[in-house]
């Protein structure tokens, strides 16, 4: 199961097929492991209960996307071009993808600038994905950069366009402690169960509720990364071959 499938319901609301594919690519290839495991709030003070604990940031992101859809029905935003509505949808899905860092390990130092960092990485990923295509839309990156509204680190990065405003409002409303969407928890649990079942079928292991690759995949990754001619890994390869021959 690809990680983007946790958001497939929301991705399918994006009208542009190219943008749908880009969002899937970003979640599957450019989002660190911490994103799928972390809660939406480090302190637990500023987000509803369903957005706390493992997977909380995933559930929060889905809530933001759902609120965005409701806001887009209001007259203030309903008359935006379909293209602009899609930018808002994409920004809502990707706005917190750098909240705690760029790599697989959490880096809380990124928090204050996470909107700007995410916008920059979306820009880079866009040009990796759409090779030879149009430039990444500034409307998209600005909406990601400004999603914290009045709490954005730099005044010049605060919401300006209607796209910016709808993304910020969706994030703000979905972050209120009194907010609750039971459906999100139910669907997250269903998706997580499916992920575990598919991982077990593919030979992965579940350790402490984490999906862990089989030993041969770990060894293979080490061997693939080894510089050509380096023999230090050969004892490990020989030992693995022996284990396979004598299970």
Predicted regions and their residues:
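Divalent metal-dependent phosphate-bond-processing catalytic cores, especially two-metal-ion Mg2+/Mn2+ enzymes
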Residues: 1-25, 52-59, 63-86, 94, ...
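Short acidic/histidine-centered micro-motifs embedded in hydrophobic/aromatic stretches
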Residues: 25-33, 40-41, 91, 143-147
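Active-site flanking loop/helix segments enriched in acidic
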Residues: 29-60
